[in-house]
């Protein structure tokens, strides 16, 4: 169960302001969880790659949070107050203005017998013997199911398939081991960055800009030097993007501002 939930924690971490694998005297590096071609390793790689690809969106949202008093992780009622079904929703949230995240919170693959052994050995200094935990027969290639709710007042796009669903309904969705349910609000503009090993490996010269039709939308791409506080003195740029849904046009305005090395 530890391996399974470690993957789920990593997938949840992708959609937190800071993604960090932290622990005391516990293995955290992905190469300690298998090798390429094995489900746990591959799922961790997928999560890390997704996080890096979302950096333009995440960094720009960080600017919205700090400069315009916005919020990163938003309870659904903050954006959909007119929908009473969101008022007490504790298993989903908005990540910025675009993403509805429904993390997998419980083990779906680990046999119940193994889960019981681990529960009985919880706590500091209490460790179940590996030989006591029957994980060898776990098939991570199987599909599972979970329920989620899409708030009323918007259409929603499945991030993985681009299938569109109307808001205001509960869905039973298929889950797989290497990803969690993830939806994008209609009208969103989401910039995706290059495939990198670390954030500053490549410049954002050729971003992929994804538009999700169904409503008007806007987004401001924010950039700065990335390694200092010069932005506090105006060393940053903004590129406004506007989606007109009726005309099906995306307008990318001129860059505003400047910083060293841009």
Predicted regions and their residues:
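Catalytic-domain carbohydrate-binding cleft regions of carbohydrate-active enzymes
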Residues: 1-179, 183-185
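Accessory, solvent-exposed terminal regions and/or long lumenal/extracellular loops of proteins
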Residues: 179-262
């Amino acid at each position: 169960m530890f391996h399974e939930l470690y993957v789920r924690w990593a997938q949840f971490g992708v959609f937190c302001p800071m993604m960090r694998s932290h622990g005391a005297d516990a293995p955290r590096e992905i190469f300690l969880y298998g090798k390429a071609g094995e489900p746990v390793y591959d799922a961790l790689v997928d999560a890390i790659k997704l996080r890096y690809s979302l950096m333009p969106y995440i960094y720009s949202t960080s600017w919205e949070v700090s400069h315009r008093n916005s919020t990163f992780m938003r309870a659904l009622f903050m954006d959909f107050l007119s929908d009473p079904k969101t008022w007490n929703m504790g298993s989903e949230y908005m990540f910025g203005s675009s993403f509805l995240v429904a993390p997998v919170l419980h083990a779906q693959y680990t046999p119940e017998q193994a889960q019981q052994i681990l529960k009985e050995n919880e706590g500091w200094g209490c460790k179940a013997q590996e030989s006591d935990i029957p994980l060898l027969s776990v098939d991570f290639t199987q599909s599972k199911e979970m329920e989620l709710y899409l708030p009323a007042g918007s259409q929603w796009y499945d991030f993985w398939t681009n299938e569109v669903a109307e808001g205001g309904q509960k869905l039973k969705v298929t889950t797989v081991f290497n990803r969690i349910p993830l939806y994008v609000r209609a009208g969103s503009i989401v910039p995706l960055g290059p495939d990198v090993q670390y954030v500053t490996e490549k410049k954002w010269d050729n971003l992929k800009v994804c538009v999700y039709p169904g409503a008007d939308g806007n987004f401001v791409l924010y950039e700065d030097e990335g390694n200092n506080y010069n932005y506090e003195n105006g060393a940053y740029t903004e590129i406004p993007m506007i989606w007109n849904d009726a005309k099906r046009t995306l307008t990318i305005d001129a860059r505003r501002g400047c910083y060293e090395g841009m």
